[in-house]
Amino acid sequence: MVYLHVPFCRSFCTYCDFYSEIACRGRDAQSFELYAQALCAEASRRQDEIAATRDLNTLYVGGGTPSVLPPSLLRRMLASLTTGGVPPEPPASLRSGTEQQHGSFPEPFTEFTIEVNPEDIVEKGMDYVRELLALGVNRVSMGVQSLDDGILRWMNRRHVAARSRQAFGILREAGVRNISIDLIFGISQLSEAIFAETLREVLAWRPEHVSAYQLSIEGGSALAELVRQGRYSEAPQEQCAAQYRQLCDALRAAGYVHYEISNWALPGREAIHNSAYWSRHPYVGLGPAAHSFHDRVRSWNAYDGHPAGSETLSGEEEREEEIMLGLRTARGVADGRIDAAKAAAALSDGRLERAGDRLRIPEDRWFVSDDIIADLV
């Protein structure tokens, strides 16, 4: 189970504080090459760690904006994960665009997700998407965020709503059969009507998966500076809660399963890789600022991709983490993991409910789950 961080963006979104660098057109080839060399070297050093997590054979390429990279570099990085070297050219069936899993590499990934932006898909076209499929990509996560052009401009997104529509069509026509759409809610100027229209259209596309996140103000983001200057005020919690209910109601009516606080899927299309994070499965994170987890040790890279630090969790810290992550999901946590008195009180007042031999937060309380979880750890 591997996460690969691609730290490049064409521009920075208003709300984002993830580590990334501006990739300037015409001057990005050298930056991409240096990054690929460093990542391949890191993967080579960490082959034993990668092998130790292979019982769940998933790969997630996130960022940043992975879709700015050419497929040739992705192919080299994939080779460093699976063979330690550059693989041979893919067979003719893959070069022709036939969808395969993992191409010439020794083991197909059960799930291979790549994050893309709509404008890259439209600009690079169907041949680019088919190259991704030839590499083994079998799931695409696209950052739509909104279908309102005014909201997109405020976010400093490079695409307009029409690009998202085009990009989704290109992905489908190219043969992508597992698409996840990212949305954002909880923006002051996002009205109920605008959000309802975005939801209506996205659900009409029938993606296999939807992730929706409440806007948060992160310390290193441009949004934090806007707040400091008095140029933006957070949306009231009542507005955010109402939009979360809109999400839940619309997606439920459309047949999606609400399996994690911010994630919905058509039955059987839940994200395997991300679900493993919430169940605390070991994983290796490669690239600048990537995080890893194995044998009770959480570690993280510096911005240059080299190890920056680690911490070993105590038994009590593991229990608390299991509760915090598990209660974000519809599966919940095993009965007995939460202090008995706290669990009894939460069951009595409706903050928890039983689901077989497990305890979970009822869906209608998920919006306030942070407060509930804080009381239970």
Which role does the model predict for each range below?
Residues S96-E99:
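N-terminal polybasic/positive-inside topogenic patches
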Residues P7-F18:
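Local cysteine-cluster metal-coordination motifs and their immediate loop/turn environment
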Residues R358-P362:
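Minor-groove-contacting beta-hairpin "wing" of winged helix-turn-helix DNA-binding domains
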Residues S348-D357:
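A short, conserved structural fragment
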Residues W366-V377:
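Short, amphipathic alpha-helical interaction segments positioned at domain boundaries
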Residues R337-S348:
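Short amphipathic alpha-helical interaction segments
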Residues M1, S20-E49, D55-P87, L94, ...:
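C-terminal scaffold of the Radical SAM
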